[in-house]
Amino acid sequence: MAGHSKWANIKHRKGAQDALKAKIFNKFSKEIMVAVAKGGSDPNSNPALRLIISKARAKSMPKSNIEKAIAKGEGSTSNGENFKEIIYSGTLSHGISVIVVILTDNINRAIASLQALFRRANGQIGKQNSIPYLFEQKGYLEIEKNNLDEDDLMLFCLDNGAEDFQSDGENYMIYCQPRKISELKNEIEKKFSPNFRAVEISYFPNEWVELDQENTEKILNQIDNFLDDEDIQNVYHNLKFA
């Protein structure tokens, strides 16, 4: 029975991980389709597509999935699958500010779902396409340390447009202006050939809010509920947690 229970737990964890991967890949697929529809299917002449492909590869999205999304993007206008991006700000309980990025083919459905999510979280939805002063948009690169020399990489990044360079136990984190991210990523790749864990343009808070463990978990669960929605691509917040 113990062995059966262990196998059941492993199966459950693997199922949850597979479901999470599928959800992440689906979000990337939508971003790729939008980028292709706007700027064409050639990453060399479409920097937005090039960046999204880099993000997807950093999260181990299979090449076949990327190619399918590009093909769907090329036919998106003819088959009516047109996605639009909208951004909403808002607040959750305890003064937590959020930015919600939506990518949807049905704006009315997406907004109705978003309003319901804020109500359930005892939060308040803000204005569309209004970014609160608490957040700043930056390019973000995360690289596995492996055997990379920290000083060499840091100096190279700062010489090539990076604004900040940080490290933790396993990774280097590099910040830059959004317009610099593709160029900086390409220069790092040519020089060091590292393993990128993240390549993205994100919103970073200028001020953090720290809560006790119980309320932190409640807010994180609320954010997870937002991310479970099929139309929500990302949620940025100013909750500080260990």
Curated annotation (Swiss-Prot):
> Which keywords does UniProt give here?
Cytoplasm, DNA-binding, Transcription, Transcription regulation
List the GO biological process terms.
regulation of DNA-templated transcription
Q: One Pfam match, by short name?
A: TACO1_YebC_N
Q: Which GO terms describe its molecular function?
A: DNA binding
Q: Where in the cell is it found?
A: Cytoplasm
One annotated Gene Ontology cellular component of this protein: cytosol
* Main localization (coarse): cytoplasm
PANTHER family hit by this protein: TRANSCRIPTIONAL REGULATORY PROTEIN YEBC-RELATED, TRANSLATIONAL ACTIVATOR OF CYTOCHROME C OXIDASE 1
* Family stated for the protein in its record: Belongs to the TACO1 family.
Protein name in the entry: Probable transcriptional regulatory protein MHP7448_0474
Per the UniProt record, the source organism is Mesomycoplasma hyopneumoniae (strain 7448)
Q: Mind giving the lineage of the organism this protein is from?
A: Bacteria, Bacillati, Mycoplasmatota, Mycoplasmoidales, Metamycoplasmataceae
